[in-house]
Amino acid sequence: LSRMLVGALRCISGGFLRADVLQVAKSGFSSLTRDEADSLENYAITHGINRGKWLRPFPYGDDAADMDELRVRLISPVEALRDALRRAKTAGDSVEAIFRFLEDTNAYDRLMAREETLLSRGMAAEATQNRQVWTILMTLLDQLYALLSTQKANQRDLAQFVESGLTGASLSSLPP
C-alpha cells in the first residue's frame, strides 16, 4: 500500500517516470494482476514508454489495444488524484484527495484481503504488520491534515511528507 501511494504521488510530482508508474503497477494494490503488470512493464521497456506517453493511448505493436487497456486501468486513478491535487487550494484539500484515491482504488479492501490470505497461511505476524500499514497511513494523513490543513502545499512537498512519514514508521518491516 505504501509503495502504491508513494509511487502515485511520485508519478504526479515527477512527470510519470516509468519507474514510478511501474511501482504503482507492481504494488499489489493497483487494479492489475502481477502478470498484467509484468506485461505492461515489458511493453513499456520495449516501446520506450515514459513520462507523457503514459497519458496517451499506446500506438505500438500488435498488442497495443490490450496494453492500452492495462494503461487506462492503471493510470486513471492516478490521473484522478493528480486532477484533485491540482484543484486543491490547501494541504487539507490535498489530504482529502489522497483519502479519495485510497477509496477509489479499494485500498482498504485489498489490504484486508491480503490480511485474510496471510492469516489463512498461518502468518499472523505478517498479518499484524499488514494491518499496521493502514493504521500508520491513516495516522499520518490525519496528522498532516491537522498540522497543514489551511496551508498551501504543493504536490512535491506532499509526496515528500507522505514518503518520509511512511519511511519513518516504527515497524520492524513495513510491508508493501
Residue ranges and their predicted role:
Residues L1-P176:
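Polyanion-engaging groove/track-forming segments
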